[in-house]
A protein has these predicted regions:
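The feature encodes a structural signal of leucine-rich repeats
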Residues: 15-20, 41-43, 65-67, 89-91, ...
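Leucine-rich repeat
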Residues: 1-4, 23-27, 46-51, 70-75, ...
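Leucine-rich solenoid repeat scaffolds
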Residues: 142-199
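Conserved hydrophobic beta-strand positions in leucine-rich repeat
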Residues: 7-9, 28-32, 52-56, 75-80, ...
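Consensus "Asn ladder" position of solenoid repeat domains
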Residues: 12, 35, 56-59, 80-83, ...
């Protein structure tokens, strides 16, 4: 397996835990999506330092996102959606300097959206929908001109969406429905959806 660069075992009805031995490979892409894998994401995956794309979407993975993944300095795309991951969004995000797409939707993540996400200049797509995130949206995230898509719908977010989101030079696709944002809403947001405002 020394010459293996891309491991794709998607949609194979695989069960059990993700083998920690995968961390010994020298691959740039790992795709295990749409299986029935359980347990935690192995810390050993942090040893895949050449990894550009990690896709563990649509399994039954539990636990927290391991801190070891901060070692994946070349990571451009991380897809962990449709699992049962818990905990807060980790500060290890700061280690992903070239990350372009991050999808953590449909998990059980809690806590605040870290401001570090707004300083990820490479980030183009961020999907945190269908979790239990609360607090405000970091202003610097809305002002990130490289961000093209921001999905935060169906969380427990609250506060006021700042008008500065309308001052962007580059367009962005936003979905905020089913949160607790209070009016007034920025004029440039055409669809805010149902909100449960605490005021």
């Amino acid at each position: 397996l020394e010459r293996l660069q891309y491991l794709n075992l998607a949609q194979n009805q695989l069960t059990g835990h993700i083998p920690s031995e995968l961390g010994k490979l020298n691959i740039y892409r790992l795709n295990l999506e749409f299986n029935q894998l359980t347990g935690n994401i192995p810390e050993e995956l942090g040893s895949l330092t050449e990894l550009v794309h990690l896709n563990l979407e649509s399994n039954q993975l539990r636990g927290k996102i391991p801190v070891s993944l901060s070692k994946l300095k070349r990571l451009k795309k991380l897809e962990l959606q449709n699992n049962q991951l818990i905990g807060k969004l980790p500060e290890i995000i700061s280690g992903w300097k070239v990350l372009e797409e991050l999808n953590l939707s449909n998990n059980k993540l809690t806590g605040l959206i870290p401001e570090i996400l707004g300083r990820q200049d490479s980030l183009k797509v961020l999907n945190l929908s269908f979790n239990y995130l609360d607090g405000d949206i970091p202003i610097n995230l809305l002002q990130n001109e490289n961000l093209e898509l921001l999905y935060l719908h169906v969380n427990n977010l609250q506060g006021i969406i700042p008008e500065t989101v309308c001052w962007r030079e580059n367009p962005i696709k936003l979905l905020f429905y089913s949160n607790g944002f209070c009016p007034p809403y920025p004029e440039c947001i055409k669809y805010i959806g149902k909100q449960i405002c605490g005021n």
